[in-house]
Amino acid sequence: MTRAMATIPYYDAEAVARATPMPALIAALLRAFASGDYHAPSRLAADMGGASLLVMPAWKGHARVGTKIVTVDPRARPSIQSTYILSDRASGRPIAAIDGAMLTRRRTAAASVLAASRLARPASATLFVIGTGALNAPIVEAYTSAFELKQILVWGRDADKAEAAARAARAQGYPAAAIATVEAGLAAADIVSAATLAVAPLIAGSALRPGMHIDLIGAFRPEMCEADAETFARARVFVDTHQGAMDEAGDLLQAIAAGAIAAAAIEADLAALCSGAHPGRGEDDAAITLFKSVGTAIEDLAAAELVVGNVAP
């Protein structure tokens, strides 16, 4: 026997973008991480032979539960595609279906900037974005919402795509330019944000300067890597979640295996930074800070609640 299911609203990519202005989204993530009310187990990550399948559930007390299904395939365009289902926890009934790809892009960028607001020098003026994929534009949008940037540099393996990304940023009023090498970007940047599917280091620790902040978004599988072991050895290291980092953060795990850093040297996670349990950078202007993220379903749920306009408990 079949039975008709009540229709639930679907929020497409455009609706998600409209509903998640970066200042509001960053604030929503801050509340979620500081509250301790949001919970997420380790995500299921499956290798599909050159591609990845991720299933990410989370819940907020007895109020909400959400699940995101993601595929990541470097051969696909866009490379990240997903759907998010937000449900009422008490009844189990779905409340909304949401474009998970846009939700992921925006909450990922917002989480990085939330961390940077505690770890980067407030006067940081130059952002260097490594990667020209779907995260490039949200990263630029998020950082410009929180820092008074005078220069945004973009690098990608494909120079034409880097120029296109910079041109798109300029069209939005941002002071962006493509550059030819990673080395040139590292030499100029106050903040470096890498969002790639790299399996070999792009960032060399030897090129880092005192006071920089490094934001590593890619390398969400153990075999992936955006920064070399020396990068971690020279930096004060922070993560989005300890469990996620130790399970999946490729470049961090490789640095630990190489003896460049001990797991115990990780200073804090995003919850500690948001709750005030850890002061973040503090007054240490000379420190190199590093935020390694692999993503957490807590971010998805907080963002989904913002999308449907229901952030109350």
Enumerate the predicted regions with their spans.
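Short alpha-helix adjacent to the SAM-binding motif of class I
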Residues: 163-168
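N-terminal ligand-binding/catalytic initiation module
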Residues: 1-105, 113, 120-123, 298-301, ...
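Generic secondary-structure signature for well-ordered alpha-helical cores
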Residues: 21-22, 30-38, 74, 117-121, ...
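Glycine-rich adenosine-cofactor-binding loop
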Residues: 112, 123-146, 152-161
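Rossmann-like adenosine-cofactor binding region
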Residues: 172-257
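Residue-level signal for well-ordered, solvent-exposed loop/turn and beta-edge residues enriched
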Residues: 91-93, 160, 260
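Adenosine-phosphate binding glycine-rich loop
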Residues: 225-313
